[in-house]
A protein has these predicted regions:
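Short, flexible micro-motifs
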Residues: 121
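Non-catalytic beta-sheet/beta-sandwich ligand-binding modules that flank or precede catalytic cores
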Residues: 1-115, 124-127, 135-183, 193-202, ...
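Beta-strand-rich recognition domains
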Residues: 187-190
Length: 215
């Protein structure tokens, strides 16, 4: 009688998403005990090791550079104890961690609104970047920006309720694959009023005025 070929029943990643150039642990579960197995993530080979349960194999791999939202896992050349080889499986993939950047901008003076912009990778058009501005008294202003087709975003934040001084802006978000970008932040100096500049001629004029003495 022909024996059933082994099959891959599950594949998991730890962490569930990872950045390019960082290591991820992969756990493969099969329906039968195996004597051999191999796998690749985005073309990079995993060094698989059989666990105490020969149905479970694990390995680490560095996430390769890719422009895609995910990187594909290919499991192949896996043999059961009778030498039967299972079919190549490419049904699993891991999201690559998206990224957010905040652009550079100047200190804000004499204005209560600041325009903040930035870029993203692995966010699709219409997805949302969450922002918050925090002053030195921990007062918070929240905002959100919509990612455009080219991956950029822009938002105007109203700072009128915040205290003058150093403001820290934070940006974060998750894409459609529930992969969360690392939060980024930047700081700037905020002054809601414009400094009054006294003309030099007024200084000369006032100095020439006779001082009034109390009677």
């Amino acid at each position: 009688l022909a024996q059933a070929l082994p099959t891959l029943t599950n594949a998991t990643f730890n962490p569930t998403h990872q950045a390019e150039g960082q290591s991820v642990a992969v756990r493969l579960e099969f329906d039968k005990a195996l004597q051999a197995a191999s796998a690749e993530l985005g073309g990079s080979a995993l060094a698989l090791t059989k666990t105490a349960d020969a149905k479970v194999w694990t390995g680490d791999v560095v996430v390769p550079v890719s422009s895609e939202l995910t990187v594909g896992l290919v499991v192949k050349d896996y043999q059961d104890l009778s030498g039967n080889t299972g079919a190549e499986d490419s049904s699993h993939s891991m999201p690559i961690t998206p990224t957010i950047t905040i652009g550079t901008f100047s200190d804000v003076s004499g204005n209560t609104t600041v325009t903040i912009n930035g870029t993203t990778t692995r966010f699709e058009a219409g997805e949302t970047i969450a922002l918050k501005a925090v002053d030195t008294d921990s007062l918070v202003v929240l905002g959100s920006a919509t990612v455009l087709v080219d991956g950029t975003w822009t938002v105007d934040l109203d700072l009128s309720t915040l205290k003058d001084g150093v403001i820290t802006v934070y940006a974060n978000g998750a894409n459609s694959l529930f992969a969360t970008a690392d939060e980024v932040n930047t700081t700037f100096n905020y002054s809601s009023t414009t400094a009054l500049v006294v003309p030099s001629y007024w200084e000369r004029y006032s100095a020439e005025l006779p001082s009034q003495k109390a009677a």
